[in-house]
């Protein structure tokens, strides 16, 4: 028994819980919200994946520059694209090891060590304005030949440009 200002009541006399109608209304509201939110979450995930790939590329440009200075040799990046889901890039030591040509921005043989190889997710496409889709940093951390360029990464709704400044070799990331 519980005493209230209206008198004594047994515990079983108090109404509790929700009615079936109230539960159905809440479920209907939640379903309507989910129908709106779920497609937006899918697009959000795609855009986050694109941003992650772009940021990784910026990091790999910076890594290549630092490695070139540290190793006192050319470090090159090559970009391969055009196939469905086959877009990729490679960062390698272009030191002429194994009879190759140092500084030509071509991985002449397996003796020129691969530092990083990245396969781009199939929902992200890659394109490049670099001559022959190759770029490199010399032993002083400047672009080989003093050329700059842009790598564009995009999906169906968004695009990012990774820009290498000519002469200085600085890297910037811009949502385009």
Question: PLM features: residue spans?
Answer:
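Low-complexity, S/T/G/P-rich flexible repeat/linker segments used as non-globular hinges
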Residues: 2, 142, 156-176
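N-terminal leader/signal peptides at the extreme start of proteins
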Residues: 1-18
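Short beta-strand segments that buttress and anchor functional surface loops
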Residues: 151-154
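Type IV pilin-like appendage domain
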Residues: 74-136, 161-162, 172-176
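Membrane-proximal N-terminal amphipathic helix
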Residues: 43-76
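Alpha-helical hydrophobic helix detector
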Residues: 24-40
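Internal alpha-helical transmembrane segments of multi-pass membrane proteins, especially GPCRs
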Residues: 16, 22-25, 46
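Short, solvent-exposed loop/turn segments enriched in Ser/Thr/Gly
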Residues: 146-149
């Amino acid at each position: 028994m519980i005493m209230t200002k209206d008198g004594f009541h047994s515990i079983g006399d108090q109404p509790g819980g929700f009615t079936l109608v109230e539960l159905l209304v809440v479920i209907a509201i939640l379903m309507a919200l989910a129908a709106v939110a779920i497609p937006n979450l899918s697009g959000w995930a795609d855009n986050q994946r694109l941003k992650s790939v772009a940021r990784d590329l910026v990091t790999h440009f910076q890594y290549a520059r630092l490695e070139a200075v540290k190793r006192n040799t050319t470090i090159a990046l090559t970009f391969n694209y055009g196939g469905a889901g086959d877009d990729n890039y490679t960062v390698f030591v272009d030191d002429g090891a194994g009879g190759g040509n140092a500084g030509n921005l071509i991985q002449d043989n397996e003796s020129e060590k691969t530092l990083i190889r990245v396969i781009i997710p199939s929902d992200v496409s890659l394109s490049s304005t670099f001559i022959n889709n190759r770029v490199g940093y010399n032993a002083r951390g400047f672009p080989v030949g003093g050329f700059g360029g842009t790598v564009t990464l995009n999906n169906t709704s968004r695009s990012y440009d990774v820009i290498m400044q000519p002469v200085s070799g600085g890297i910037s990331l811009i949502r385009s």
